[in-house]
């Protein structure tokens, strides 16, 4: 009889914390990085206003989810070295949460700005250098549809032959 009472007390001592969640940690997933299913395809690039890399170029876009609930971090997967014509080019990320209908957009650079912007000759003009290399979008949780265009200044237009496209699940 004593042995069965001891076993019952031990079983009760082990199950009570589990039932009430005592000692159980909160399950969290590690952030997940992926590349959008379709990269941005730009072009044609030629002549004095083109950039190195060929007539038609691709810009893969990476997205990181799971760092914070309802947020996605976007950046170009391959950051390009500085070239003076990049001063007039940037990416625009547009997104729509398919569960809530929430929408948003943000601009970012896909190139390193190596120019000393403290010099008066290097200030003014193009504003693309002011954009960050990565942006965080407050999309909310759920499936999020993303498009990314490659835009240029002078004239203001998109030169994306095919916009980057992807669908993400944001926790």
Tell me the role of every PLM-derived stretch.
Residues 24, 64-67, 79, 132, ...:
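Secretion-targeting segments and adjacent low-complexity export tracts
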Residues 43-93, 98:
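Short, surface-exposed binding/anchoring microloops in extracellular/periplasmic proteins
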Residues 96-127:
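Extended, solvent-exposed segments with strong compositional bias
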Residues 32-41, 77, 161-171:
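Mature exported/compartmentalized surface modules and terminal targeting/interaction regions
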Residues 1-50:
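N-terminal prepro-regions of secreted/extracellular proteins
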Residues 75-79, 90, 109-113, 147-152:
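Generic short beta-strand segments
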Residues 38-40, 45-48, 52, 67, ...:
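A taxonomically broad motif for mature regions of secreted/extracellular
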């Amino acid at each position: 009889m004593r042995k069965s009472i001891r076993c019952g007390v031990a079983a009760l001592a082990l199950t009570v914390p589990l039932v009430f969640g005592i000692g159980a940690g909160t399950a969290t997933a590690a952030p997940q990085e992926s590349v959008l299913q379709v990269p941005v395809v730009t072009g044609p690039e030629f002549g004095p206003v083109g950039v190195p890399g060929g007539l038609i170029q691709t810009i893969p876009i990476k997205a990181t989810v799971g760092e914070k609930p309802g947020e996605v971090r976007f950046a170009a997967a391959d950051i390009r070295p500085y070239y003076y014509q990049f001063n007039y080019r940037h990416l625009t990320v547009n997104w729509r949460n398919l569960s809530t209908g929430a929408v948003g957009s943000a601009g970012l650079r896909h190139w390193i700005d190596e120019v000393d912007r403290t010099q008066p000759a290097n200030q003014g003009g193009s504003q693309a250098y002011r954009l960050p290399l990565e942006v965080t979008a407050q999309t909310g949780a759920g499936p999020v549809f993303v498009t990314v265009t490659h835009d240029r200044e002078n004239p203001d237009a998109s030169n994306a032959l095919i916009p980057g496209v992807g669908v993400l699940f944001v926790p």
